[in-house]
Each structure stands twice: as structure tokens, then as C-alpha cells.
């Protein structure tokens, strides 16, 4: 956000340089990304007074003798401009000077006549009409008559100023304005804050009634409006034009400029509706109807749905709430009556609408971070004061203030000085802490028992508890007061990995050997990820912990599954042209015992696998799981279960020792169809996901893995082709075979066949069996007995027949 140094000085008596203030802001938690001097690139440009003029024959040039004070009283400079006269003061760039853009001025001959510099226009100094009147006139910039020759040009034309480009963090929406930063500057310097005038007086009655209603108070907690008649469009005063220009806006008209000025100064977005264009003189704040359309002020048309909040008249939408007004209700030179609007809109709604429509504005940027419910009152009062001060219209007695019914109260935090100091780890004198909090507009009521009842300003919605107060204290007191020390509880160890860390590293190395690359994603996402996986409303995974101060709504909850993050990584790879790959992530998910949370959530370590590409299949993930089982000396069983985000016929649940570990399989077709990737990618891509409870997996591991010596006797191999019902799972057959004989050491599926000769609803599955005895060689008779028993068990339990 851009904040002019000169504008800050209107609210605070600043007695430090811009560079010193930059350092102080940084020490208090505000990152100044850039301190921009307005006179950057300008040197040795001074006020010059034209004392002689002579037309240079045969050319368009005029030879001037210029008085530049201490730099010389008779400097000869030629110019091609024609708008100056004898006695005018103009900017003179002397020999050796520089101008914006790296332009260097040197003495040279022009049409055979020596010229020792250049007389400048406003544009050559980087000025425009809003920054300094006359800057865009064709010709030289004519300076005020009382300008002193030889004076540096910067203070004369207002270039002796700086712009602070400040990065505002998500938890400080109150600082999205010049006044918000001024509050902080006042606290930093210990100076009083001079609030802008907000008084006004209604001077007439409305000429006709207006209806204002809010149908969606959950999305619009407060809506204020005031009717102004007899609008007088005109030009804004120079000071307002300069404020806007320094922040990167051009002046349009006095009334439009007032709305923009209020946004920049107070941080309160506002809009003005031309009542002559509002059907039925009705304003209705409601959800959009499916398929409704609006054309915004920038002449873009959008099709809306009930997820969008709109301002409507009696017939149609006239504004996208919190984003931009409609072209059908904007003011023009014929406007005579306006309804000024200031409101608080739900930031989630504004953000989602802005993203969905691809429509951003200065207003939406502020609403997305949050505008407190007291702000509309201040913003509207300031705008009405300016309307009256600039004589832009007649303020009527008709005003509206519609709320969701919640009282507007300051937050109270009961704490003690010891608690605050305990968080900081240092001792700060009580009175010092009180002074700091009061400078930041908190009130501190010291109780009889020594505790403090601290109330936060209405605009500080980020302050919730005493650690927040501790943060306010230390950023003003100074982080340099905190002396680095070792943690009292820190234990000195010899280093090395513990058992759990070794097991994790073992699993990761095994997966890497299987061709999987490790992914690392954020621990946050949004509820939209659950919708992406088609999770039902009652699914346990939806019981996610919400972040109080999220960076954005896309990162507003703690993850309860890794699969959404893995799927997003796969989609991102596909979008960037990576058509195949294998990925894994081992990270915690955060599970609350109840919501809202009352104790620390369980951080369950989880393993997620992802494979994508035309050549990948179900057995890619299953093979990795089998390798994992072998690595830890385990045996996995697979059962058919339904998972919302997996294909019902190409997925399975994983069990070990009767304990459910997780699921894996192919991404459900309907989810694959909704992915934001090209259609040809959807048709050719195979996306497989798996998610396992790593903690449950490790609970099945019985201490360190013990290895057995290889048997000196070769195993006996047998192949079985079995005909079974389509519903019989491969895992069921494998489990039955293993349990039928102790000689079975390995069962592998190597073929599946379906054909009309098998009968309807039948399939053939072929398995390779290894039969071995560690103490002796298995005879042919023993092998036949084992196979006979296996076939008997398969027929009895599963109805399988030998093919």
C-alpha cells in the first residue's frame, strides 16, 4: 500500500526523516518494501528566472538568459517552447544535471548557439496536472512568481516528498489506509493523532422516499447509506488531487474523488448510486439469482449465481457488493441526486466472488482482508464532511444504518502484567506497558486485585487474548530488549536419529527406490478441497480446525487428509506439462476431538501416495505398499470398500493384523472430469492415490525387524487358474491360500481373464504359488497334498473352481 510522507504529516507532527521513520516502522512490524523519493533521478535542477529573451533567427528556438541565483545570474539556455514570457520562473536543468529516466543534460550547441542547460516542462520532471498545476501544458512549466532563483526545484513543485510502499499483513486490515498507518506512526513517535474532520450538518429534507433493505445480513453485517441532493459536479481542490496522485489515482470529478479519497484515507470502500438510474428508488442487498447479469463500471459483463452478493434496485443488480459498481447506476455529468453507501461485507464472499469472476479492485482488496463494523460509520461521516466542505451537494436528513443485530462493543481482555511479561520472557515496567497500550488506543483499567481489564479499539479485531497484548507491547517497546538465551528446558544430546525418525527415513528411502519423489505441501487448505473430493457433509474429515487469522481463505483450515493436497500437486504438474510421475508425502494431519477445540488436536502422521501418467495403474501403488510391508516385515490384506474419491471398482482398503490402515485406488471418474486440466489430459491420464495412517502402520511393527536365513532348499512352484464370481476379491483368494497350508511362502496374481466361455458374472484369476520348508526339501507328494487342501478350502469358502 502506498502512503505519502506528506499526507502522514497532516495527522501526526513528525519530527524525524522519512528514512528514520522507515526504520521505526520496520522495528514495529511493518515492512516498508520500498521508500520512493519523488525527486528520484533529478539533480541540479533549480528555479530559473528568465531575464532576457531573443528569438533565434531561422529557427524555432528562443535564446534565453536565465537567473539561477548562486549557480549564475546570466546563464544562456535555448528552448523550443513558446509559452513563456520575460520574468517567468521556470525549471532550469543546468549543465551536468540529470532528469528522470537517466537523462543527462550537458552544455551543447543548438542551431549553432551555445546552450548551457535545458528549460523543463512538468512532464520532463515526472509531474502531472494533479501533482502540480500546469505540468501537462505544452511547453515549459511556469512556476509561481514568488519562486526564488537558484532554489532547488523539488520543494517548489512538491517533489520533496516520499512514498512509503508498505506491505500490510493479513492480521492488520486496520492499516489498509493512510489514517491506519498514521495511528501507528503517532504511537511510535509518542505524538498525538490529529483525526480528519468528520462533522457535517443535514441542510434539507429528501424530495422523495427511498427504500433500503438487507436480505443477506450474514454477508452484510452493516449497511449505511445517506441521501444527498442537488449534486454539483466540478473539479476537486488541488490538495485532494495531489493526495490521489501520490497514491496512483487520477482525479475525475469532485464527487468521484471524494469516494476514492475516503477509501485511501479511511480504508473504507464506498460507492455512490445515481438515484435517477435506480429503479423504484430501492436498494436491496441480496444474493444474486442464478443467471443474473451485470455490467460493471469497467464495461465487463458477468453472469452471477447465488454465491455472489449484489446490490440491486427494484429490477436488477446495480453493483457487485464489495467489488465494483454497475455501469447502469454510475454517476455522470447529469447526476443530481446520489445515495452514498458504506458497508461491511463478509470477506469470504467478496474473495470468492472476486476470484470466480476474475474481477479485482481496491475495494475488494480491502474487504478480502477485512473491514470492521465501525469503519462504515467513520467513512460515511468523512465523505459527507467533504461533500459539505467542497460544496458538492446538499445533505438531506435521510440516512440508513442496517445491522445484523450484533452490538458494536470493544473486546475486553482480563490479564495481568506477569502474564504479558511471561510471554515476552523479559520484565517490562507496568507503567511502560500501560503507556504503550494507551498510545495504541487501548484502555487499561487496573483492578483492585492487580489484574488489568484491557479493552481493544473497535478497529483491532485481530486482538483476542493476552499474547496479542504482549505482541503489541514488545513491538513498541523494542525487540532489541529481548536478550537471546538458551531454553531452560533444552537438553543436551549427542545427536542422531531416534527410532521413529529412523523408521520414517527407512520408509522414505524405500519409496524413493520405487521411483517416488517426495512432495511437501502446506498444512492448511480450504473446505473447497473436501468438495473437490466429493466428501459427504457428515464425513469425519470435514470436521476441520478453522484458523482464526488465515493468510487467505484458501488456507483457512488445518488439513485432515493429505489426498487433496496430493491431488492439487498432481494437477499442477499436469498443467505445467509434466505428464507422468510418482509422488509421496509423509506429514501430519490435524484431528480435533471436538469442535470448537478445547485441547491440543491429535497430530497423526500420515502417508500419501500419488501416481499419474498413461502407464501407471492400480498395481503401481499396490506394489509400493507391498514393498513397504516387506520392508517392515508385515503382511497387508486388501478388502473392497467404497471411498467417495476413489473408483468403486478400482480401489481397496488396506488392513494389517485386522487393523485398517487406509485406502488406495484410481481417482473417481466424476472427480477426474472436474479437474481443471485439458480434456485430452483427462482422457489419457490415470491418476492413482493412496492414503495410510502411518502411526497405525508402525503400531503393527514388532520392534526391530529380524531377518531369517535363506532356505538352502529350492521352493516348489505351482500355478493355479481359478474360476470365481466377479465379486470375489483377489485379496480374499490370496488370504485363503496362505491359511490353507504352512508351506505357502508366496502367492502372486499373474493373470485375470474374462470371457463368454466362463459364464456370466464369472472371471478367471491365475496365481503363482511358492511352497517351501526351511528344514527340508518339499516333496512332490507334499506339494500335491498342499495344493489339494488349498483347492478344497477355496471351493468351500469362496466357491472357486479349478479352471
Task: Name the predicted role of every residue range.
Residues 413-579, 718, 770-774, 782-803:
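Extended, well-folded interaction surfaces typified by the phenylalanyl-tRNA synthetase beta subunit core
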Residues 1-202, 206, 339, 358, ...:
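Phosphate-backbone binding interfaces of nucleic-acid-interacting proteins
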Residues 5, 23, 53-55, 189, ...:
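Glycine/proline-enriched, intrinsically flexible loops and inter-domain linkers
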Residues 39-43, 200-202, 491-492, 496, ...:
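Beta-rich nucleic-acid/ligand-interaction surfaces
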Residues 114-130, 135-140, 154, 162, ...:
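Mobile "lid/hinge" segments at catalytic clefts and subdomain interfaces of large enzymes
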Residues 2, 20, 27, 438-442, ...:
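A carboxyl-terminal module marker
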Residues 185, 189-214, 391-420:
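Terminal amphipathic helices with adjacent charged low-complexity linkers/tails
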Residues 33, 47-77, 242, 246, ...:
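Conserved mixed alpha/beta core segments that line enzyme active sites in large multi-domain catalysts
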